[in-house]
Each structure stands twice: as C-alpha cells, then as structure tokens.
Amino acid sequence: MKGLKKKRRIQIIALAFVALAGSTALIGYAMRDGINFFRSPTQVVEAPPPETEVFRIGGLVEKGSLVRGQGETVTFRVTDTNATVPVSFTGVLPDLFAEDAGMVGTGRLVGGVFEASEILAKHDETYMPKEVVDALKEQGVFQHTEDQPQG
C-alpha cells in the first residue's frame, strides 16, 4: 500500500512538471513576436540583424539629415556619434521629433536602411529613453546632468 502511494505521488509530480514545462514553452512561443530587442546604431552597423527581425533602434537624429519625401514618407539618419544608420518612415512623426534630438524607432533593417513602423521622440527637453542613455554612455558621449530624468 505504501509503495502504491509513493508511486502515485511520483506520477503526479512528474505530470505537474511536464504540464509546467509545456505551458512555459507555449507562453514563450506566443511571446516571441512581441519581444523587440534594442540596438544602438553601432551595434546595427557592426552586426546587422536579419531582415525578418523586428527590433528597436535609438539614438540622436543626425543634424541636417531629415528629408520629407512624397506624402508622409520621411528619411533621416540616427546616430550614436560612432555610427549612423539611415531610417525611412511612412506615417505621421511625433510633434516633438526634431533633428539633434533623441528618438527610438521600431522596425526592420532592409538593404541597410532601417524601415521604421513606429517612431517615438523624447517628451521634453531633458528626458531621454534609458536604452538610448545606456548606448550613449557605452560610447562615452553621454553627459548626465542633475535635472535630467532617465527612463
């Protein structure tokens, strides 16, 4: 009788482990398209991601690079001062989007051009997204001031 209870308990524990592992795998599989990794322009230039990968890029909009094309198409270059990546975006830019200002874009790298599906701009004079701050610090060009909130 004791051996049967022990065997049954082991079976239940094994079944619970398999169910937990299966549900974790299903959740991970379902979330794979919702995860966008952040890259700096230097990282994109050094190791370009595959064209099918959606990721986020952030940095400063290079001064003098903003060109408004036909309709809602806009091209510009994003830089972290070490590398520059051309960006193409079709849509309405945020009101605070400007040259020499911080931005984060979501999209794909196609033929060396980042085709953005979404563009976000910093929301005031002192804010900069945490990922952009980290990338600029890594390049040694970010200078933090006391009144500059991050992230």
UniProtKB/Swiss-Prot annotation:
One of its GO terms (molecular function) is metal ion binding. The keyword Cell membrane applies. It is a single-pass type II membrane protein. Heme binds at residues 123, 127. Residues 31-151 are periplasmic. Its main location: membrane. The keyword Magnesium does not apply. HAMAP family: CcmE (MF_01959). This is Cytochrome c-type biogenesis protein CcmE. It comes from Cereibacter sphaeroides (strain ATCC 17023 / DSM 158 / JCM 6121 / CCUG 31486 / LMG 2827 / NBRC 12203 / NCIMB 8253 / ATH 2.4.1.).
